[in-house]
């Protein structure tokens, strides 16, 4: 779902938040509900360094920079050249230019050569298996797991995460169980799960996940906290829970 703002005189070619603007006209995937939910929800601690895998326009990095007051260095890795350039431009134009750095790279190669490790990794990853053609190769790269499979994503996150780190993703509900099964086979365990539905009368259509990794005894000791989030009430107004989660970002909240 892509958000449309109806406030007049907003800048075009992107999305205006309360404290920053995200230009996305050069990106295959525009600012949408999935990314905003993840950026607003991710549990933050006293992080050492944050990584956004497949950062696109740089939305998640900007949201996490706002939430942390720019206290933590944030790296974004993006394969698509046009998107990575736009992400860097968005970061440079934001109040947190000093703490965000964008790397135009394939995350698989980056994970094999990077020497730094991260206490928090986030991703709004490709989610469709190959099928119906997209309008462009750029959009297909952003949406389809042919470019970055979930197996490869988990492997890269495992290589780059600190021992006590956290990996957070947003996924379509239809992909979540398969993703969790893959994760468990690679010594990951979900410690937080939020099932998201557009309304109480609609089925869950996206899932927010926080995963941690460790040895067998550590993994078995992790307890899952599972909750739900409804975006709109029956009257189609944003729910109080959704407003509380996103009010620091949306102009309309």
UniProtKB/Swiss-Prot annotation:
Pfam families: MTS
Bridged cysteine pairs (disulfide): none
Any single GO CC term annotated in Swiss-Prot or TrEMBL for this entry: cytoplasm
Keywords assigned by UniProt, alphabetized: Cytoplasm, Methyltransferase, S-adenosyl-L-methionine, Transferase, tRNA processing
Entry's localization field: Cytoplasm
EC number of the protein: 2.1.1.223
GO molecular function annotation: nucleic acid binding; tRNA (adenine-N6)-methyltransferase activity
GO biological process, one term: methylation
InterPro entries in the cross-refs: DNA_methylase_N6_adenine_CS, SAM-dependent_MTases_sf, Small_mtfrase_dom, tRNA_Adenine-N(6)_MTase, tRNA_adenine-N6_MeTrfase
Catalytic activity as recorded in UniProt: adenosine(37) in tRNA1(Val) + S-adenosyl-L-methionine = N(6)-methyladenosine(37) in tRNA1(Val) + S-adenosyl-L-homocysteine + H(+)
Domain of life from the UniProt record: Bacteria
Family classification: Belongs to the methyltransferase superfamily. tRNA (adenine-N(6)-)-methyltransferase family.
Function: Specifically methylates the adenine in position 37 of tRNA(1)(Val) (anticodon cmo5UAC).
Classification via PANTHER family: TRNA1(VAL) (ADENINE(37)-N6)-METHYLTRANSFERASE (PTHR47739:SF1)
Full protein name: tRNA1(Val) (adenine(37)-N6)-methyltransferase
Lineage: Bacteria, Pseudomonadati, Pseudomonadota, Gammaproteobacteria, Enterobacterales
